[in-house]
Each structure stands twice: as structure tokens, then as C-alpha cells.
Amino acid sequence: LFNLYFTPGFFEIEIKDGRLTGSLMDLLKRASPRLIIALGMTLVIATEGIDISVGSIAAIAGALAVLTIRGGDITYLATQGTSTVPLILIIVVALSAAALCGLFNGILIAIVKIQPIIATLILMVAGRGLAMLFTGGYVLNYDHPTYESLGVGDWFGVPVPIFLAVGTFLLIWLVTTRTPLGLLIQSTGGNETASRYSGTNTKVVKIIVYVMIGLCSGLAGIIFTADVQSADAAFIGLWIELEAILAVVIGGTAMTGGRYSLAGTVVGALIIQTLITTLLTRAVPVQYTLIFQASVVVIVLILQSSKVKELAFKRRAKKEARSHA
């Protein structure tokens, strides 16, 4: 509503050169990689976990994708002609690395029994350094029109990143609703001990969700590097873990595990992107955006805490007792 008031044409969509354009389409495109990561984060949080390494995993995937395009050469910074490396090879390399990162986190958490925030903190720090090692600390450019289309291209007039985000949502929705995985995730996050006694291999469930968020992060890294036609390992996916967590909690998923909502996460991601877009168009310094996002996370966590729920329950019980008196 704020955007609509100050920019009356915010929701207008036009067709130019066969493409859908407008502020709304740009918002959906920019929200796509954040939504993809947030969907994976939803499943992780549903198992009572957390992953703060998603930005670094995106950086690793993006760096390896560009490095594959360049044939592993970082000795020159400018592009040297159009690359002919097959797109499928680029994607396989990037997503395989991202999946391995997720597997690493999953093993540390499920097998080694390290706390999720500590386990993913390891890769958050080391992963960013690893991505910078891949690129030699440089911003690597490339020329590969097919790969670039994943970030700036369109299918049937709609930006490709939107298709990728919708496809990711549908795939995760199908996996969690048409297979037992969704129920296993909820039972693992709701009561891991009871779930384990009932025969659920909670270790495998946790490893699966961390591999899934690794793949989501890798796909986001591909979109990021395809969008700007370069790889800057120091900034790919920077702070996106905060945005993903915020989208999940705004969407109604409980940080205590168990209950989750993929549809709610979609709404949360769009709200976050709208907020970012609004602040940028109003020339608000980026540091205030980060402060606001962190504040919302803290407030939501407080509201979801057992102490607040206990106080709310007691207050509701007193009101009911008075009404019956």
C-alpha cells in the first residue's frame, strides 16, 4: 500500500518486446532467489534446526559455476570470447558442490551431534573463504549467453528466476505432501525422541533437509551470478540467511520445530523483498534495513518463546474464568 501510494503504477504490468515489465515483475524476480533459499530453510527450521551458511553455499556454487564457464582459468579478469561449456555441466558442478556442503552440515548435526548454529557457522565462515579461494579473490566476468539467461532471460515473457522459484516450490511441495517426508519432518521437529522411538530414522531426515537447503542455496547462487554476469565471492548471498530466516518466521513456521508452512514462507519472502525494494526506492541506507530485519526476528522469537506462550495461556484462562463467574 505504501508503494502504491507513492508510486501509483507499482502494480502495473506492461508488455515490451514480448516481455512482461514493471515494478511488480521486478520485485518478483528479485524475490526469487531469496524465496528458493527460504523454502529450504523452512524444512530445516521445521526439524528444529537452523542454517546460517546458505549465503556461503550460494557463493561456492556461484563461484564454481563461473569457474567452470571459464575453464578453471582465473589468470585473466576480462572475458576472452564466448564460452561453449555445456549448461548442464555448469549446473551439475555448482549443485553438486552445494549438495556436498549441505551433506557436510547434515553429518555434523545429525551424526556428530553439533548444535545446528555452530555446525553451520563453520561453513558460513570457511565456505566464504573457500569461494574466494576459487575465484582468487577477484571478481570474475564471463560470456555465456545460455547461462546468463537463467538470471536475465525470460520464458514466455516471464523472467526465468520466477519460473525457477515456482518450480522449486512445486517440487518441495510435492515431495513433502506426496511422500512421507513431510510427516517425518514434522515429527522429528515436534518431538525427536518420540519420533525416534516410533521407528523414524531422524538422522537421515535431518541430513536430507540439509542437503535440500544446500541445493536451494546452490540454485540461488546460480541465479545471482547469472543476473550480474560475474562472480564476486565476497558478496554473493551476503546476509541472505537473515532474510531467509525472517521470511520463514513471518510465514508462520515455528522456530521450535514441527509446524511449518511453505505457502506462508512464500508470503514472507514477498514481504521481505517488498520491504527491501521500498527502502531502496526511498533512499534509506541499507544498514537500517538490516537493523529492521534483525529486530523482527528477535520480536518473533520472543513471541514464540515458551514463556510468552505460558503468560498468554494464563491470561486467556483468567478471562475465561471471569466470563463463567
Report residues per predicted region.
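Alpha-helical transmembrane segments within multi-pass membrane transporters and channels
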Residues: 75-124, 267-268
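Inter-helical junctions in multi-pass inner-membrane proteins, predominant
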Residues: 6-30, 131-132, 154-158, 176-182, ...
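Transmembrane alpha-helical segments in multi-pass inner-membrane proteins
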Residues: 217, 228, 232-294
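Helix-loop-helix "hairpin" substructures at the membrane interface of multi-pass membrane proteins
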Residues: 86-94, 100-105, 157-232
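Single transmembrane alpha-helix segments in multi-pass membrane proteins
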Residues: 2-6, 20-73, 107-114, 245-262, ...
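Transmembrane helix-bundle core of multi-pass membrane transporters
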Residues: 88, 112, 116-179, 205-208, ...
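Cytosolic-side transmembrane-helix boundaries in multi-pass membrane proteins
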Residues: 1, 5-8, 170, 197-204, ...
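Hydrophobic core segments of alpha-helical transmembrane domains in multi-pass membrane transport
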Residues: 1-4, 41-42, 94-98, 124-130, ...
